[in-house]
């Protein structure tokens, strides 16, 4: 019996490269919330589709935003 053909998932495109965004602002919490899980963790590159440079920028912006108390460190209590 032959194996079924396995489709490769389509590669996600970096949102920031597509829109030519040069600076990710830590005060833009509505944008940054898209890159945070419901538990408050920063989502991985393979999940969000960001390139490596913009993933680093997002992580830095999220950390700065948490430090300024604009975003929570965790979202749910255990």
UniProtKB/Swiss-Prot annotation:
Assembly description: Part of the 30S ribosomal subunit. Forms a tight heterodimer with protein bS6.
Official protein name in the record: Small ribosomal subunit protein bS18
Homology family: Belongs to the bacterial ribosomal protein bS18 family.
GO molecular-function terms, A-Z: small ribosomal subunit rRNA binding; structural constituent of ribosome
Domain of life: Bacteria
Alphabetical list of InterPro entries matching this protein: Ribosomal_bS18 (IPR001648), Ribosomal_bS18_CS (IPR018275), Ribosomal_bS18_sf (IPR036870)
Organism: Parafrankia sp. (strain EAN1pec)
Xref: HAMAP family: Ribosomal_bS18 (MF_00270)
The keyword RNA-binding appears for this protein: yes
Known function: Binds as a heterodimer with protein bS6 to the central domain of the 16S rRNA, where it helps stabilize the platform of the 30S subunit.
UniProt cross-references to SUPFAM superfamilies, sorted A to Z: Ribosomal protein S18
Pfam families cross-referenced by the UniProt entry: Ribosomal_S18
Listed GO biological process terms: translation
Keywords linked to the UniProt accession: Ribonucleoprotein, Ribosomal protein, RNA-binding, rRNA-binding
Cellular component, GO, one term: cytosolic small ribosomal subunit
